[in-house]
């Protein structure tokens, strides 16, 4: 009987923990998949490639990661990366920094939001 109660309690706790996961986490899972598919040609989370590393980008000043050789335009932009600035950047980088090196654009607002939520979730840790 004690084993049955223990197993039932474990199952109930697992059920509660699984279904109490915040909705933002679900978005982050899709965002991670989109990030890996759409962004990792140039970016990594923790290492520099042809683009800067992106873990911790939320709250970071533009052009401020010392491990990446930013353009003069990006260094002089002086914005802080948040949902709004990242959305503008991913929509049309040229509108924020003319003659930048990022030739990539994302027209799908839902995909941008998922990737931004994913990057934000990584910056919160």
Model-derived regions, located:
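Positively charged n-region of N-terminal signal peptides that target proteins for export
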Residues: 1-4
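Bacterial N-terminal signal peptides
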Residues: 9-19
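Cleavable N-terminal signal peptides
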Residues: 12-13, 23-25, 29
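Sequence/structural segment immediately N-terminal to covalent heme-attachment motifs in c-type
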Residues: 27-49, 54
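Solvent-exposed, acidic/flexible segments
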Residues: 28, 32, 47, 79, ...
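Short glycine/threonine-rich turn/loop motifs
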Residues: 28, 52-72
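Short Fe-S-cluster ligation motifs
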Residues: 67-87
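C-terminal capping alpha-helices of c-type cytochrome domains
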Residues: 82-125
């Amino acid at each position: 009987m004690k084993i049955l109660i223990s197993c039932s309690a474990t199952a109930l706790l697992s059920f509660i923990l699984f279904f109490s996961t915040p909705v933002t986490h679900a978005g982050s899972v899709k965002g991670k998949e989109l990030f890996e598919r759409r962004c990792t040609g140039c970016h990594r989370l923790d290492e520099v490639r042809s683009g800067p590393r992106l873990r911790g980008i939320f709250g970071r000043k533009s052009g401020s990661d010392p491990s990446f050789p930013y353009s003069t335009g990006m260094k002089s932009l002086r914005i802080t990366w948040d949902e709004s600035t990242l959305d503008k950047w991913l929509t049309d980088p040229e509108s924020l920094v003319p003659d930048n090196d990022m030739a990539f654009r994302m027209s799908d607002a839902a995909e941008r939001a998922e990737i931004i939520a994913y990057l934000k979730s990584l910056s919160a840790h």
